[in-house]
Amino acid sequence: MSLTNTKTGFSVKDILDLPDTNDEEGSITGTEEDTEGSEATKTPGVLVQSPLENVQNLPLKNPFYDNSDNPYTRWLATTDSIQYSLHGLSANSQDTSAKSPEPSADESPDNDKETSSNGSDSGKKRKRRVLFSKAQTYELERRFRQQRYLSAPEREHLASLIRLTPTQVKIWFQNHRYKMKRARAEKGMEVTHLPSPRRVAVPVLVRDGKPCHTLKAQDLAATFQAGIPFSAYSAQSLQHMQYNAHYSAATTPQFPTAHHLVQTQQWTW
């Protein structure tokens, strides 16, 4: 008993100063707690025995202490209740996780019906295609050959003529452009950028009623006012133009009526 009075334990029994019921149990627990206390002094700050183990080692009933008013009586009744209280959350979570799919399984047919109905609606919407009549298709193709891009007023006007909406006309033009582009890509007939139409420069042979003997740079600049670069013509073509100018200047004095013909030709233009 002296050992039990001088011991310093961390169990509920020691904290509440409860007397021992059996000397053997007290001596055994006393020796165990003395050894644990000595080990605790060797390694301070480290608990060798957890409070849960101390609670499990306590006797179930104590004749010297009335614990009917103790709120922890039910908690200290059995070890099974302690383990259940510690692991109750995990068990409940497992039960709820196991039971949670049941309502979803019950509701799954409704959800499947809703999704199937939504899928059928979307499928019906996707399957709807505007069927153009032959007259509408002919008019659309004819207008597409004339003009591949339409403005908003032109689109509305064409839609009113063939009894369609502007959106339908717009979508038809987009699809037709894409179809034509894909057909050209498959055939390898991609249209290259065509050069702008070239204007032919006509040499000035007569100016102000007088024949031009030579073709000067100023005259060439006047003939190229249309924007055609000077490098577009080769030197051979320029020499040919100068030769024609010299030839016309040499032949005009031999025929005095040539000047008169040129003037009348100028008036007839």
Swiss-Prot record:
One of its GO terms (biological process) is regulation of transcription by RNA polymerase II. InterPro entries: HD, HD_metazoa, Homeobox_CS, Homeobox_NK-like, Homeodomain-like_sf. It comes from the Eukaryota. Disulfide bonds: none annotated. One of its GO terms (cellular component) is nucleus. GO terms for molecular function: DNA-binding transcription factor activity, RNA polymerase II-specific; RNA polymerase II cis-regulatory region sequence-specific DNA binding. Residues 20-37 have a biased composition (Acidic residues). Keywords: Developmental protein, DNA-binding, Homeobox, Nucleus. Residues 125-184 bind DNA. SMART domains: HOX. It is found in: Nucleus. Belongs to the NK-2 homeobox family. This is Homeobox protein Nkx-2.2a. The gene is nkx2.2a.
